[in-house]
UniProtKB/Swiss-Prot annotation:
It comes from Escherichia coli (strain 55989 / EAEC). It is an enzyme of class 1 (oxidoreductase). The glycine cleavage system catalyzes the degradation of glycine. The P protein binds the alpha-amino group of glycine through its pyridoxal phosphate cofactor; CO(2) is released and the remaining methylamine moiety is then transferred to the lipoamide cofactor of the H protein. This is Glycine dehydrogenase (decarboxylating). Keywords: Oxidoreductase, Pyridoxal phosphate. Its cofactor is pyridoxal 5'-phosphate. Its EC number is 1.4.4.2. The modification N6-(pyridoxal phosphate)lysine is found at residue 708. GO terms for molecular function: glycine binding; glycine dehydrogenase (decarboxylating) activity; pyridoxal phosphate binding. Disulfide bonds: none annotated.
Length: 957
């Protein structure tokens, strides 16, 4: 039969690229699970009353090439002015070797958070390097492996200061008046829910205020002034006040370390180390503290430990501080951080080394000195005598200066009374400085760069002598070896080879949605039209961004059934926080601010109770019944008991137990009956898109993990995006922004992240995914995700019982394998199975969540039947190995499972095990072998002997 032109054009071609199983494979799997079609399977599994009659209208699919061309046209509407706005954001030069070998490399960007350290040693080493950079530059003892952005880090510093403060009755937090405005905005938002009073004043007046538990200072103020706070910090310390200092990472190359001046906490943005501005993000924040406060720090910390053979190995340390373990008692709700961006910054430091970084910092400062000298020579006045890269220039004709700047396609900071701000960066050249002279002085100024350079080279007083760094930085060999591109390329490749990412195998982590991050989706993030915009540039310069964001928001509104979407939250956990704040402020607007009880099912993600605590709510746990569903009797009792104090419920759908609960609408009705709101966690949205929606179900607000459902890669632990969808009554209460007003969202609420649209530069990934899939493809993706999970469950059921199922014995998009009976019978645990899977070439499923002693498997729609069968065969082979232990063929204390994973060194060492080397490293005929570089980690040793900085190179060899 002759095909039509429309068929030959094949606009839906990408759907077949994204979805792993082809039509024949899908039919084979449908036959295996006893379903006639995808629609029939979906109809059996999803409750009838929440199934959409028609898919959301998000348009027809587009080919990769058509979508790229369409988005390129949108991006071209952005105007790439040279921005000297500063305020924590500058242009950068990302070394091409890092661009090509990391940012554009799926071996780096498709990996998951390194909960399984044996398959994560490469990025763990890069993160340890990031921590070493932080330690060297801040002068403190302990550093984290990144936070979401500088403003979030400031809020975390405030919360940490209260945790460690000895002044238990003090409830006021002092913020110096020259911190960045967006930082103050986020601090105020966080302080409100914690019940702290924020005082903003000149830093030198801090001692005038009573009952202060913590202070936030900024080493280089927002308008450029370098502060020597040594004496002030000493006085504050004598009064037991916890001191936090915000610092500029590039300035720290030249300036004295705040830690050496007595600061307790130092933080800032690592954006200047090679990460483009991207209209606000994503960027990693660095965070450091004194050793005595290490167990109160927020976020991931990488530590040096030992493996089972006694070799040096890296792992995430002190995880008992974190939300996935401590829940509402955690130090923060941080789950996703900014690992990929932290690793870019880390490798930027490795590539340039201390000499290169000093050259860059000195060049920036020299050009700033030259600019200052020329302006002063012509009679203009500077507000500050001491500066690093930022000048605050008083101008009589400010309007004229700004007009000339616009004509020259230059952005200056314009929000300072009777002055403009100018921040230089590593991209600034002498030609740029001459342009600035022309803008500020007119064309006939007669200034000469070389003449000015000679003057300032011999007489620069812009950095106080006491503020100049007098110690060496980055002395570890890793920062002094890889400076040729060949060496750098090989070092990065050596790290990549240690890790297991989606470019090698499926990552079947339940509740994580490790789906394809298509190359066509990733390409636009490197376009300069998206990468080079300052987040506070005039809105008319960002029309492309505004169009793309508006279109993406419209699609998400239709897909979620909500009325509005706020793009600001930088992660899923931050989206939870923002959504709960919207609920809180909604209640307050109705004079019901007393509503502060948040109901959370026992099966919830750890971020849920941690976020509720951050939002100032009390957590009350709702029981689950024997089938894993919310116990409606207990829910009604808890809701009735809460009464007028009920704020909301946080519920995940499908549930974290991997089933579509039949009573989800009744759950919503019960909560609404008692005046509460329904927060539907979007973690499992990949099983909803096109089939049902949170709004249709009856929820009021949800966050969306764009790094799960909508294809932003996990990056080894970030970046992520967690925009929130809300019903109309909550729309006025989503986050706002003090610097940039968000068009279409008329809200005066505080910000939750530094930039108005969060990590805006990765939003094109989700735009591309939705555009290429269209309504038809998005629904099919959800259906195939469900099919793949049911195929795995049906084939493994006899070997590993599926703990929870819904109607007809079906699961949703993931399934929980119950290992507890096997452990009781044989002594082999879920941990042993997880580590043995490494020998078979797989990342482990999620361990012991949401039920201890289980493995939760989520295959996503992107894995083909071939890969699913490979995983299933590995699991069945492992079950056969467990039977060998059960039969006594291998002793419990010495078998391939308890000794897993196995490494290459063992092949040439003495072999005393009762199983062969072949069984150890080539089980079940594994051909395309992934080799872990370390054996099983000793977690206890790592936490008892905490060491979180670089170790000698010899330790890795």
């Amino acid at each position: 039969m002759t095909q039509t032109l429309s068929q030959l054009e094949n606009s839906g071609a990408f759907i077949e690229r994204h979805i792993g199983p082809d039509a024949a494979q899908q039919q084979e799997m449908l036959n295996a699970v006893g379903a006639q079609s995808l629609n029939a399977l979906t109809g059996q599994i999803v409750p009838k009353d929440i199934q959409l009659a028609t898919p959301p209208q998000v348009g027809a699919p587009a080919t990769e090439y058509a979508a790229l061309a369409e988005l390129k046209a949108i991006a071209s509407r952005n105007k790439r002015f040279t921005s000297y706005i500063g305020m924590g954001y500058t242009a950068v030069q990302l070394p091409p070797v890092i661009l090509r070998n990391m940012l554009e490399n799926p071996g780096w960007y498709t990996a998951y958070t390194p909960y399984q350290p044996e398959v994560s040693q490469g990025r763990l080493e890069a993160l340890l390097n990031f921590q070493q950079v932080t330690l060297d530059l801040t002068g403190l003892d302990m550093a984290s492996a990144s936070l979401l952005d500088e403003a979030t880090a400031a809020a975390e510093a405030m919360a940490m200061a209260k945790r460690v403060s000895k002044l238990k009755n003090a409830n006021r937090f002092f913020v110096a008046s020259d911190v960045h405005p967006q930082t103050l905005d986020v601090v105020r938002t966080r302080a409100e829910t914690f019940g702290f009073e924020v005082i903003v004043d000149d830093a030198q007046k801090v001692l005038d205020h009573q009952d202060v538990f913590g202070v936030l200072l900024q080493q280089v103020g927002t308008t450029g002034e370098i502060h020597d706070y040594t004496a002030l910090i000493s006085e504050l310390k004598s009064r037991k006040i916890v001191v936090s200092v915000a610092a500029d990472i590039m300035a720290l190359v030249l300036l004295t370390a705040p830690g050496k001046q007595g600061a307790d906490i130092v933080f800032g943005s690592a954006q200047r180390f090679g990460v483009p501005m991207g209209y606000g993000g994503p960027h990693a924040a660095f965070f450091a503290a004194k050793d005595e406060y290490k167990r109160s720090m927020p976020g991931r910390i990488i530590g040096v430990s030992k493996d089972a053979a006694g070799n040096t190995a890296l792992r995430m340390a002190m995880q008992t501080r974190e939300q996935h373990i401590r829940r509402e008692k955690a130090n923060s709700n941080i789950c996703t951080s900014q690992v990929l961006l932290a690793n870019i910054a880390s490798l930027y430091a490795v590539y340039h080394g201390p000499i290169g970084l000093k050259r860059i910092a000195n060049r920036i400062h020299r050009l700033t000195d030259i600019l200052a000298a020329g302006l002063q020579q012509k009679g203009l006045k500077l507000r500050h005598a001491h500066y690093f890269d930022t000048l605050c220039v008083e101008v009589a004709d400010k309007a004229g200066v700004l007009t000339r700047a616009e004509a020259a396609e230059i952005n200056l900071r314009s929000d300072i009374l009777n002055a403009v701000g100018i921040t230089l960066d590593e991209t600034t050249t002498r030609e740029n400085v001459m342009q600035l002279f022309n803008v500020l002085l007119g064309d006939n100024h007669g200034l000469d760069i070389d003449t000015l350079d000679k003057d300032v080279a011999h007489d620069s007083r812009s950095i106080q002598p006491a503020m100049l760094r007098d110690d060496e930085i980055l002395t570890h060999p890793v920062f002094n070896r890889y400076h040729s591109e060949t060496e750098m390329m090989r070092y990065m490749h050596s790290l990549e080879r240690k890790d297991l990412a989606l470019n090698q195998a499926m990552i079947p982590l339940g509740s994580c949605t490790m789906k394809l991050n298509a190359a066509a989706e990733m390409i636009p993030i490197t376009w300069p039209e998206f990468a080079e915009l300052h987040p506070f540039c005039p809105p008319e310069q960002a029309e492309g961004y505004q169009q793309m964001i508006a279109q993406l928001a419209d699609w998400l509104v239709k897909l979620t059934g909500y009325d509005a979407v706020c793009m600001q939250p930088n992660s899923g956990a931050q989206g939870e926080y923002a959504g709960l704040l919207a609920i809180r402020h909604y209640h307050e607007s109705r004079n019901e601010g007393h509503r502060d009880i948040c109901l959370i099912p026992a099966s919830a993600h750890g971020t849920n109770p941690a976020s509720a605590h951050m939002a100032g709510m009390q957590v009350v746990v709702v029981a689950c019944d024997k089938n894993g569903n919310i116990d409606l009797t207990d829910l009604r009792a808890k809701a009735e008991q809460a009464g007028d104090n009920l704020s909301c419920i946080m519920v995940t759908y499908p549930s974290t137990h991997g089933v579509y609960e039949e009573t989800i609408r009744e759950v919503c009705e019960v909560v609404h009956q008692f005046g509460g709101q329904v927060y539907l966690d979007g973690a499992n949205m990949n099983a909803q898109v096109g089939i049902t929606s949170p709004g249709f179900i009856g929820a009021d607000v949800s966050h969306l993990n764009l790094h799960k459902t909508f294809c932003i890669p996990h990056g080894g632990g970030g970046p992520g995006m967690g925009p929130i969808g809300v019903k109309a009554h909550l729309a006025p209460f989503v986050p706002g922004h003090s610097v940039v007003q968000i068009e279409g969202m008329l809200t005066r609420q505080g910000a939750v992240s530094a930039a108005p649209f969060g990590s805006a530069s990765i939003l094109p990934i989700s735009w591309m995914y939705i555009r290429m899939m269209g309504a038809e493809g998005l629904k099919k993706a959800s259906q195939v995700a469900i099919l793949n999970a049911n195929y795995i469950a049906s084939r493994l059921q006899d070997a590993f019982p599926v703990l929870y199922t819904g109607r007809d014995g079906r699961v949703a998009h993931e399934c929980i394998l119950d290992i507890r009976p096997l452990k009781e019978e044989t002594g082999i645990s879920e941990l042993d199975i997880a580590k043995r899977l490494i020998d078979y070439g797989f990342h482990a499923p999620t361990m012991s969540f949401p039920v201890a002693g289980t493995l939760m498997v989520e295959p996503t729609e992107s894995e083909s039947k071939v890969e699913l069968d490979r995983f299933i065969d590995a699991m069945l082979a492992i079950r056969a190995e467990i039977d060998q232990v059960k039969a006594g063929v291998w002793p419990l204390e010495d078998n391939p499972l308890v000794n897993a994973p196995h490494i290459q060194n063992e092949l040439v060492a003495e072999w005393a095990h009762p199983y062969s080397r072949e069984v150890a490293v080539f089980p079940a005929g594994v051909a395309d072998k992934y080799w872990p570089t370390v054996k099983r980690l000793d977690d206890v040793y790592g936490d008892r002997n905490l060491f979180c900085s670089c170790v000698p190179i010899s330790e890795y060899q």
